[in-house]
Structures are given as structure tokens and as C-alpha cells.
Amino acid sequence: MKLQTSADLQRWLQAGGPGPLHLVPTMGALHQGHAALIRAARQQGGRVLVSVFVNPLQFSPNEDFARYPRRLEEDHALALEAGADALWAPQPEDVFPAGAAGLTQLAPAPELVANLCGPSRPGHFEGVCTVVSRLLALVQPSHLHLGEKDWQQLQVLRRLVRDLRWPVQIVPCPTLRERDGLPLSSRNAYLSVEQRQQAALLPQALAQGQQLLDAGQRQAEPLLRAVRALMEDGGLAVDYLQLVDLPRLQELEQVTGPALLAAAVRCGEARLIDHRVLMSRLPILAIDGPAGAGKSTVTRQVAHELGLTYLDTGAMYRGVTWLLQQRGFEPQEGEPLQALLADLELRFGPASGTEQTLLVNGVDATSAIRTAEVTASVSAVAALPSVRAALTQQQQQLGQQGGLVAEGRDIGTAVFPDAELKIYLTATVAERARRRAADLAARSLPVPVLSQLEQEIADRDHKDSSREVAPLRQASDAVELLSDGLSIDEVVAQIVALFREWVPVEALNADA
């Protein structure tokens, strides 16, 4: 279905009824990159609306607004074939009924436009923020699908949505590329056959940045110099080439974590942008918090959602506690504990149902480590310096290559202080007691009265936060997330969205 006026849009919206509504905003000249966005929206269920609007506000006077590709009939056919329910192609008066003179414009966060395209395209991101705010107001979607190719624009809109508390979920889609690596773009149509071959040098030069990093070059200046030389030697006119952090887009002097190597070049009459996410290892997500905050369940689901390995560090401490109890040892330093740790073998096996299997010296202790007896003693065992040292070393060895999500009480402060994202997941004592009771009941275990559970949880909080070795603390750079009133799925969605601001989908997608 093709919609043109605001009245057409409102009739279509009213006829749809409740349910998810996915908006894929475009400026037209659709290609397979747009089709991927539409297909991703289709897979999530609900209705899918594609908007086509060449926004005059985001073009500077000397840019290509007048000749920007316009082919509405082809766009309509591609959108429907990819799974859209309707395509809306409004006129400027539908989006901006008061005209430019009567328009209230929105400005992006200044830090997000201080680099990359911001300085060379004055007014561009103000135009983007303004038009997207109008589209969201008119459509009121539940989901907004955006490509990671325009990473700076994506970060600007994420901040806009968060700061203005708009009830819409942003869904990123990895950059799609041609066989030679050039990102799919409507502006590729400006390139002649010869220029098209020349443009392929852009992704090739950016890929050299990762090769230099792999060879040990972490300093920005020599890395940028080498990449720029490749571009200019190939005849590309470099508008900018910068190395910035992913969430705030601030310039970096060296690569210490995931970094964005981004460029804009001119090839003939076309201005092309591209980027490469540089990583020295796969990312780590650290989730800390007090007992009963739902860390294990959340971390397991987050790891699955992100395609990362789940490292249940809490289960490791429970495994040591269970083994001490099995042998009749007190939770204290001494030769018995040293001997136990010397022979300790903890191995995670395939998930059994929804829970990861833990083998302690070859014995399946998955259920045994979740009993009330183990829960009551695990904090004291975890406070023992030798236990802490032994398990921290094991965990750090597991994390040398990255690619994992770990949960515990000191993951972000002691085990993985260089984790790309740190979450401090918490909940009130009353909420955690209620969850603990439900968990015990689900396992057919005895359920104490809530007041007893609340006291036990408060006591454990005190022990965890006051112990001398690796006390429970929120890392200074951690994001606090209070989970009261939120479902597991809602908590997972928030954490995944935060992670995607630090690590793009395409950085973990071998096909991107």
C-alpha cells in the first residue's frame, strides 16, 4: 500500500489496531541495505511502515538535495517485496505544516557532532533530529529501525530518544556491503564504472587499520597516517579520517578498547562515508550487583541475545562452597583449603534446560550449588583471599580472548576492569526476597517466610560490601540498573541496547 498525505497515514494507522508498529525511515532510492532493515522489522512481528522523505533540512546549500535519487515506484516495489505493509511518501507540507519559518528545530548533543561529519556538514544533524522527531510524532511507532552504516547519526538519534524519553525502541542493523566491501548507499549511483572501482579503496584502506592494530600499532597518529596514505595514493580526496570511541565519538590517542575508524571521502561527485570497528579482542560485558538481583538469569539471556559466552562466576564460587561442605571443611584459610584449591577443576558444560551445567571435579553439582545451605555460606567463602585469587585467575584466563558476558560481585572492579560495558544490576531487598522465594518454590525446595529471606539478603549485602577482599562495589564507570518493576525481558532489552552503543552488531557479525 502506498500512502502520501498525513490523512492517508492516519487512516492506515487507525485501521491497524494494537500491536507493534515498526518504522523504517529512509530518503528513498532504496537498496538491499534498506531491504535488510525491512526484513529485520518483519521478523519481529507487527506492522512495518517504510517512510520515504528527502528531508531538505539535512542538506547544506551546496549539497545534493536537488539531484538526490528519487524513484518512488521502484522504492514501493522493493519495500513491499522485503515485507513492508505500507510505504508512506509525504510532501514537505505534511511533515512540516508550518513551513521552515514556523518550525521548531531540535539540536543534537554537541559532543556527538564535534567530530566526523559534524564540522563539515553544519546543520545536517539538526535537520536529522528535527525530521525524525516529526516522523515519530506522526507515526508513533514502537520500534525504529536504523542502519549502523551511519553510526554517527545512529548515536545522535539514540541520545535524542533517551533524553526526550520517547517510548520507542531503536533497533540497529549491521552495515551491508557490496562484494568488494563498499557499503551499500544511495549515493553510489553517482559513481561511474571507473569511480566505482576507485571507491572500493575506501573499505580496503580502513581494513588496513585493523591489520595495523593486529600487528601491535595502537597509537592513533601513525595508524591514521598509514590509512590516509592508502586513500590518497588511490586518488580519494579525504574529507576526514578519525579514530574515535564508539559511544561518544570523541577522538582517541590510542586504541584501548573497541574504536571507530571512520572516514568521509570524495570520489568524483560522490561523498562517501565508511567506518571500521577496530578491536584487539572480542568485547566483554560485566554485570555486577547484590545477591538476588536476577544477575544469573539476565546474564544468561543477554549472552544468548548477543551471541557471546556466558561466564557464571557466581556458580564457580558456589561450586567451591559446595565442595567445602561435602568435605566437611570450615570456610577458612588453611592447608585443607589450599589442598582443595590445588586440585580444583571447574568446568561448564552444555546447558541443561535453561541452566548451564557445572561440573565440580567431574561431578554435576548444578542443582546442589543452589540449595539454601550453599547460599548461606557462599559469601563467607567468596571473601577468602585464596579462593578469590584462584577463581579470579581462572576467570581472567577464560576472558583473555574476550567474547563473554560475566556476572558476579566484582567483575567490573577486579576481574575485568577493562570490560567494554559494566552494568550494576540491583533491586530492593523486598523485591529480591520475593524473587528468591519464587525461585526456591520453582525448584521444589523449602521456602522460608519472606521476613527471614529479607534478613538473610540484607545480612549478605552487608558481608559482601564490607569484606576486605574484593568487596561488592559499583564500578565508577558502571551503569546502574534498578530492576524493580521490570520483567526479565525488559531488563535484558535495556542491557542489550546499552551494549549496542559500545559494540555495533556488525562488530560481532562475521557476515557484516
From Swiss-Prot:
UniProt-listed Enzyme Commission number(s): 6.3.2.1, 2.7.4.25
Transmembrane annotation, as ranges: none
SUPFAM superfamilies: Nucleotidylyl transferase (SSF52374), P-loop containing nucleoside triphosphate hydrolases (SSF52540)
A single cellular component GO annotation: cytosol
Keyword field: ATP-binding, Cytoplasm, Kinase, Ligase, Multifunctional enzyme, Nucleotide-binding, Pantothenate biosynthesis, Transferase
Amino-acid positions noted as binding ATP in the UniProt annotation, renumbered to this chain: 27-34, 147-150, 176, 184-187
Pathway membership, UniProt: Cofactor biosynthesis; (R)-pantothenate biosynthesis; (R)-pantothenate from (R)-pantoate and beta-alanine: step 1/1
InterPro entries: Cyt_trans-like (IPR004821), Cytidylate_kin (IPR003136), Cytidylate_kinase_dom (IPR011994), P-loop_NTPase (IPR027417), Pantoate_ligase (IPR003721), Pantoate_ligase/cytidylate_kin (IPR024894), Pantoate_ligase_C (IPR042176), Rossmann-like_a/b/a_fold (IPR014729)
GO terms for MF: ATP binding; CMP kinase activity; dCMP kinase activity; pantoate-beta-alanine ligase activity
Active site: H34
Binding site for (R)-pantoate: Q58, Q153
GO biological process, one term: pantothenate biosynthetic process
Recorded catalytic activity of this chain's protein: (R)-pantoate + beta-alanine + ATP = (R)-pantothenate + AMP + diphosphate + H(+); CMP + ATP = CDP + ADP; dCMP + ATP = dCDP + ADP
Residues reported in the UniProt entry to bind beta-alanine: Q58
Record region (Cytidylate kinase): 277-512
Family: In the N-terminal section; belongs to the pantothenate synthetase family.
Function: Catalyzes the condensation of pantoate with beta-alanine in an ATP-dependent reaction via a pantoyl-adenylate intermediate.
Name by which UniProt lists this protein: Bifunctional pantoate ligase/cytidylate kinase
Origin species: Synechococcus sp. (strain RCC307)
